[in-house]
């Protein structure tokens, strides 16, 4: 138990610093060398797709079996027997809850859903993407709007146009990111086995670092002062450690109520991973017209790495 607690505390510290570094580096890099940021687009995209594979394995090879196992223990305490797929239902409830949260943010937003003019972006959308929609959970790095280049057929996105991102939009992005970051942290904090903590940490660290990079790019393009950017970055970076802390508190609770809360929250967190994989990462990355087969390869590679770790009980 002591080793497990130490592992979770190390995860808290690790994810916090990965996210903090990921969100603040773009603020300096884009200000000093936009071309360097442009060249890193492909690397970020492949890392994001690799993260999608990691989350697939996390959801179906680690979280779902854990929820099933804990659910069986909870039901046996109440002498309840059922063949209904309760674990899968709880996981999908988490998925629907995350979809609802995203659509709620879009519905009540007075401003446009993207950090840039959708008309400007969509006028040149045939350059690199088939999409005309930008999720509020995704910054420019994941939607790749920051890197559309002029090809001489219609308006294209200029570097100067990117600086119009308002602080209100940045704050709404930070809120949206924080909302499901807490659930990702909960999933880590609720784990009872060391190998599952490690596999979850890899998935969360890869994904959340890329999320932080997206936030950092948005802050850089909005010309946010470094001090304010640091405050926002610290706030968002603290959400996963907060979730891990909440998970630790719930996991330490004794009796049936603590077990029920643990299995429900773990299942809902699994639904959040499902949302991130299919609607955030894959929906955006695989619609890009470049490197599609390479992205599929990285997706399978990400899944294989985590599935192998679960199989070997590493």
Curated annotation (Swiss-Prot):
One of its GO terms (molecular function) is zinc ion transmembrane transporter activity. The keyword Mitochondrion does not apply. Residues 1-3, 64-85, 191-196, 251-262, 314 are extracellular. The modification Phosphoserine is found at residues 125, 129. It is a multi-pass membrane protein. GO terms for cellular component: apical plasma membrane; hippocampal mossy fiber to CA3 synapse; plasma membrane. Residues 25-42, 107-169, 218-229, 284-292 are cytoplasmic. Its main location: membrane. It comes from the Eukaryota. InterPro entries: ZIP. Keywords: Cell membrane, Ion transport, Membrane, Phosphoprotein, Transmembrane, Transmembrane helix, Transport, Zinc, Zinc transport. It is found in: Cell membrane; Apical cell membrane. Transporter for the divalent cation Zn(2+). Mediates the influx of Zn(2+) into cells from extracellular space. Controls Zn(2+) accumulation into dentate gyrus granule cells in the hippocampus. Mediates Zn(2+) reuptake from the secreted milk within the alveolar lumen. Belongs to the ZIP transporter (TC 2.A.5) family. This is Zinc transporter ZIP3. It comes from Homo sapiens (Human).
């Amino acid at each position: 138990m002591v080793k497990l607690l130490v592992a979770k505390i190390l995860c808290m510290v690790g994810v916090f610093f990965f996210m903090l570094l990921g969100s603040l580096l773009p603020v300096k890099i884009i200000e000093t060398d936009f071309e360097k940021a442009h060249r890193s687009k492909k690397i970020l995209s492949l890392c994001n797709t690799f993260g999608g594979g990691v989350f697939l394995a996390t959801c179906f090879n680690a979280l779902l079996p854990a929820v099933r196992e804990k659910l069986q223990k909870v039901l046996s305490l109440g002498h309840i027997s059922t063949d209904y797929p309760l674990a899968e239902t709880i996981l999908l409830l988490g998925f629907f809850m995350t979809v609802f949260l995203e659509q709620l943010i879009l519905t009540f937003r007075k401003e446009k859903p993207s950090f840039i003019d959708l008309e400007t972006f969509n006028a040149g959308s045939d350059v690199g993407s088939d999409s005309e929609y930008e999720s509020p959970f995704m910054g420019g790095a994941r939607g790749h709007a920051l890197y559309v280049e002029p090809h001489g057929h219609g308006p294209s996105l200029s570097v100067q146009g990117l600086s119009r991102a308002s602080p209100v939009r940045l704050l709404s992005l930070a809120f949206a990111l924080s909302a499901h970051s807490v659930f990702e942290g909960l999933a880590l904090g609720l784990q009872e086995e060391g190998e599952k903590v490690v596999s979850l940490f890899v998935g969360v660290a890869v994904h959340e670092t890329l999320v932080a990079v997206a936030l950092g790019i948005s802050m850089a393009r909005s010309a946010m002062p470094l001090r304010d950017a640091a405050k926002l970055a610290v706030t968002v970076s603290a959400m996963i450690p907060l979730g891990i802390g909440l998970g630790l508190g719930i996991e330490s609770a004794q009796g049936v109520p603590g077990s029920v809360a643990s299995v429900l929250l773990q299942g809902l967190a699994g639904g959040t991973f499902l949302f991130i994989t299919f609607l955030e990462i894959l929906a955006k990355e695989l619609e890009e017209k470049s490197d599609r087969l390479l992205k599929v390869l990285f997706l399978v590679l990400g899944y294989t790495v985590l599935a192998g770790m679960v199989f070997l009980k590493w």
